[in-house]
Regions:
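Bacterial N-terminal signal peptides
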Residues: 10-18
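A domain-start/cap signature at the N-terminus of enzymes
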Residues: 22-78, 86, 104-106, 111-118, ...
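Structural recognition of the beta-strand scaffold that forms the well-ordered cores
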Residues: 62-63, 78-82, 87, 117-123, ...
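Active-site rim elements
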Residues: 154-159, 248-259, 331-341
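The feature captures the conserved acid-bearing segment of alpha/beta-hydrolase catalytic domains
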Residues: 210-307, 318
């Protein structure tokens, strides 16, 4: 495994190529005691490797990244990261790094590590052969949809009806046997299909997640109803020129075609569920020096939300279907707009999560 100073990596066996995101069960008797595994995986050299399989979910292991400074036995915040449709956990790690440089201090997992968070890169369902979105080595999550002409997001996992809520719960249960998870500080972020999956987690797993931060993917699952057990804080990020998941909703898609839920409908839904004043107030964020790409960021804040249910939207004007200040995996001709450099997405996500643990 590549040496990553300051961070310990716990990686699964599957090492598959990044295709551009539009994205065997464990034997409990052989599961290491939490303190032993934590101690072995938190080496400052980052040299400790192990396979973390999810019981009952063969071929869906996950990568765990721990801050090297983490002390075993100390409760730690956890960020679950969900890749886009047509990608995988390795691709998502690259996507969230500037220019795809895994050594950059501005990678999402490195920013989170500096803030003392454990990062989990989850893996969707792998479909054998077929179209690009279902090709071997690229994966999807069942993020909902499929009603009244709205696309079922996304691909093979959706058509198979994979229970990805159960998968994520099983992943968290497994993780809790290995490190001391702080149950009040469990968060989820994702891109595209993974963003829509994060939205679904807020609907159906509000007992487990304190906050979510979807990027370039809206709440398609709400078409079937969304009734969270308690308020979940939401940071929603989306580019106005996204050609894959149009900001205004409607027909879109880089690969799969069909109707997509709009940003406005998603935000209105969360405002109602979280008891917020429905009309937000807008603030244009100051530009980042040297990032002269013609894009800008407008922050929408919703007032008077229920406790634990803060709602914020970052409208990235001119951004296409990209993780802003990440890896430009495709041309704007295909996915719309440009990749904005006016938002440090990783920092925005980590800062939001840091302020939204449950009381």
């Amino acid at each position: 495994m590549q040496h990553r100073p300051g961070i310990a990596i716990v990686a699964g066996l599957a090492l598959v190529a990044f295709f551009g995101a539009c994205g065997g069960g464990s034997d409990p008797a052989q599961t290491p005691a939490p303190s032993a595994l934590c101690a072995s995986s938190a080496l400052p050299s980052g040299a400790a490797d192990t396979t973390i399989a999810v019981a009952g979910w063969p071929d869906r292991d996950y990568d765990l990244v721990l801050p090297a400074s983490h002390a075993c036995g100390t409760p730690i915040a956890v960020m679950v990261v969900l890749h886009g449709g047509g990608s995988n956990k390795e691709g998502m790690r690259k996507l969230t790094c500037p220019e795809g440089d895994l050594t950059s201090a501005r990678c999402l997992y490195r920013i989170a590590g500096a803030a003392g968070m454990a990062v989990v890169f989850a893996n969707g369902t792998n479909a054998p052969g077929g179209q690009l979105i279902n090709a071997n080595g690229v994966r999807t999550f069942d993020a909902g949809g499929g009603q009244n002409g709205f696309i079922c997001v996304s691909g093979y996992a959706c058509t198979r009806g994979v229970d990805d809520i159960a998968y994520v719960r099983a992943l968290l249960a497994d993780l809790a046997t290995r490190i001391d998870v702080d149950p009040k500080r469990v968060f989820a972020t994702g891109f595209s299909n993974g963003a829509a999956m994060a939205q679904r987690l807020a609907c159906q797993a509000a007992d487990a997640f304190a906050a979510v931060a979807p990027v370039s993917g809206e709440n398609q699952f709400a078409l079937a109803g969304c009734d969270p057990a308690r308020p979940v804080a939401v940071l929603d990020i989306h580019g106005t020129l996204d050609a894959c998941w149009p900001y205004a909703g409607g027909e879109g898609g880089c690969i799969d075609s069909g109707l997509y839920v709009s940003v406005a409908d998603t935000l209105a839904g969360w405002a109602a569920r979280n008891g917020c004043v429905p009309a937000p107030h807008a603030t244009e964020l100051p530009p980042i020096a040297g990032a002269n790409d013609g894009t800008s960021v407008v922050r929408l804040d919703y007032d008077d939300c229920d406790a634990g249910g803060e709602l914020v939207h970052l409208e990235v004007v001119g951004n296409g279907h990209f993780w802003p200040r990440g890896y430009a995996y495709a041309s704007g001709t295909l996915v719309g707009g440009v990749m904005s450099l006016q938002l440090d997405t990783g920092q925005a996500v980590v800062d939001f999560f840091a302020g939204h643990g449950r009381p």
